[in-house]
């Protein structure tokens, strides 16, 4: 149910990829178009960047600080998963510029989570979120998905209740999409999981959540994102939707600049080949209409 960048890895592959990503950042650092800009938001998305080793995360974050002309009130989001919220990683992220965490909870309900391949039970999810919040050094937002197999309206309300109780600064509520050929689609087709909710039922779940959050003073920042504190600015998403210049770095990254939309190579091998040859690893460059 995720159509974003996905690749398997091991430590050697990870080390080499981060080497190339840093090389790409360093190669762009002195370009006039980037050097003369001010970067207000950095979004390290995925994939699952929190899976990086502490050493590689530190190297990457320090390269971002060195190579990009960051505004003094910049937002630096690290996207990730609950399972990675361990002290040896948290300490590195927060000491090296991360000031916003976006985490894929999907559901707090243990059985629902396990059905879609999530490792941690409800107690662990809440414990790890609390561990991050106790640092008091970044905005914390989570993703919840509605329409998951076995997730009825009662469980959905429990998810929303736990969202409030968790104390996070905001949340994205996403409708489940089941892609043809995906593991989730196969599990449903084979009877291993119950069907996902219908579109009509999902619409009811969204309407319920909208009313539920509005009654609890949550602010709706865009069609699917809510904030409950001034700490959560959702700056990257706001700027992206406003047509601001976006500089892409890393395999599969997309951007837009001076009337052109860009996509960097999604496959690791050509991405690394172009970077090591001293070239920007464009897969596509299209003039915006």
Pin down the residues of each PLM region.
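C-terminal scaffold of the Radical SAM
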Residues: 7-31, 37-289
């Amino acid at each position: 149910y995720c159509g974003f960048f996905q690749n398997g890895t091991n430590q050697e592959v990870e080390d080499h990829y981060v080497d190339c990503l840093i090389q790409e950042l360093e190669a762009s650092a002195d370009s006039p178009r980037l050097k003369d800009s001010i970067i207000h938001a950095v979004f390290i998305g995925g994939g699952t960047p929190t899976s990086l080793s502490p050493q590689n995360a530190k190297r990457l974050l320090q390269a971002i600080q060195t190579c990009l002309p960051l505004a003094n009130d910049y937002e630096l989001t690290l996207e990730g998963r609950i399972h990675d919220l361990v002290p040896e990683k948290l300490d590195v992220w927060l000491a090296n510029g991360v000031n916003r965490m976006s985490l894929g909870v999907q559901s707090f309900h243990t059985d629902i989570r396990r059905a879609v391949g999530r490792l941690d039970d409800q107690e662990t999810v809440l414990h790890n979120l609390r561990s991050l919040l106790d640092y008091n050094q970044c905005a914390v937002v989570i993703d919840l998905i509605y329409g998951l197999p076995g997730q009825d309206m009662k469980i959905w309300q429990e998810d929303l209740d736990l969202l409030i109780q968790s104390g996070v600064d905001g949340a994205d509520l996403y409708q489940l999409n089941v892609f043809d050929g995906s593991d989730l689609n196969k599990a449903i087709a084979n009877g291993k999981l119950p069907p996902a909710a219908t579109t009509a039922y999902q619409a009811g779940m969204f309407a319920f959540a909208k009313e539920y959050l509005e009654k609890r003073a949550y602010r709706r920042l865009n069609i699917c994102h809510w904030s409950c504190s001034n700490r959560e600015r959702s700056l990257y998403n706001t700027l992206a939707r406003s047509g601001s210049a976006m500089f892409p770095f890393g395999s599969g990254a997309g951007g837009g600049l001076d009337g052109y939309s860009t996509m960097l190579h999604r496959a690791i091998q050509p991405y690394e080949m172009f970077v090591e040859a001293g070239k920007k690893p464009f897969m596509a460059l299209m003039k915006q209409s």
